[in-house]
From Swiss-Prot:
Pfam families named in the record: Ribosomal_S2
Coiled-coil stretches: none
Any one cellular-component term (Gene Ontology): cytosolic small ribosomal subunit
Upper lineage: Bacteria, Bacillati, Bacillota, Bacilli, Bacillales
Transmembrane intervals: none
UniProt protein name: Small ribosomal subunit protein uS2
Family: Belongs to the universal ribosomal protein uS2 family.
InterPro entries per record: Ribosomal_uS2, Ribosomal_uS2_bac/mit/plastid, Ribosomal_uS2_CS, Ribosomal_uS2_flav_dom_sf
GO biological process, one term: translation
């Protein structure tokens, strides 16, 4: 039984690529045809590629690997947060801060600062501080939470990246490649598939398409975790 069906992909509009004038020739092998100036993605290939990505993620998660979900475009923000939280993984759904991976120590300092402010609030220190100072701290906390909330529990570099639209997330992709972190990506007809280890050829602009594919990656993690729980129970 395949991980995803052709019907699901069609209903979510996964097959709609970009306009033919905005394409990357390297994506040619994933294109089925052209219709009304738009490339149509070969969904048989997508089914196969989703399966490959799913198996890789399941295997990784079964061995305790951590995945960072990355999608900062409007169409991806909600799905990335929801699905990463559902499978208890990390995410970046606002702006990617340069150095999130390659300058991890600095990012950790910012996370430490976020934790300090959270602790001050919990311990009631806000109640005794001047109002102006409290407003300033709350603003700082909001900003840090916005950009780092999805990775504040990420104590070390992730074992893989799941990226929606590698063209938009090119800084994240470049950092992962520099550190030899494998990348799974939803890759539309205007992207370069060579940058990605596990290419999922698909529409990266439709909310439903992004949600469907992101949920499959989360499912793979959850399947691995359920397998672990079952193994522990059997012992």
């Amino acid at each position: 039984m395949s991980v995803i069906s052709m019907k699901q992909l069609l209903e979510a509009g996964v097959h709609f690529g970009h306009q033919t004038r905005r394409w990357n020739p390297k994506m040619k092998k994933y294109i089925f045809t052209e219709r009304n100036g738009i490339y149509i993605i070969d969904l048989q290939k997508t089914v196969k590629k989703v399966e490959e990505a799913y198996n890789f993620v399941r295997e990784l998660a079964a061995n305790g690997g951590k995945i960072l979900f990355v999608g900062t475009k409007k169409q991806a923000q909600e799905s990335v947060k929801e699905e990463a939280e559902r499978c208890d993984m990390f995410y970046v759904n606002q702006r990617w801060l340069g150095g999130t991976l390659t300058n991890f120590a600095t990012i950790q300092k910012r996370i430490k600062r976020l934790r300090e402010i959270e602790k001050m609030e919990e311990d009631g220190i806000f109640d005794v501080l001047p109002k102006k100072e409290v407003i300033r701290l709350k603003k700082e906390k909001e900003r840090l939470e916005k950009f780092l909330g999805g990775i504040k529990d990420m104590k070390e570099l992730p074992d893989a990246l799941f990226v929606i639209d590698p063209r938009k997330e090119r800084i994240a992709v470049a950092e992962a490649r520099k550190l030899n972190i494998p990348i799974i990506g939803i890759v539309d007809t205007n992207c370069d598939p060579d940058e990605i280890d596990y290419v999922i050829p698909a529409n990266d602009d439709a909310i439903r398409a992004v949600k469907l594919l992101t949920s499959k990656i989360a499912d793979a993690v959850l399947e691995a975790k359920q397998g672990e729980e079952a193994a522990v129970a059997a012992e």
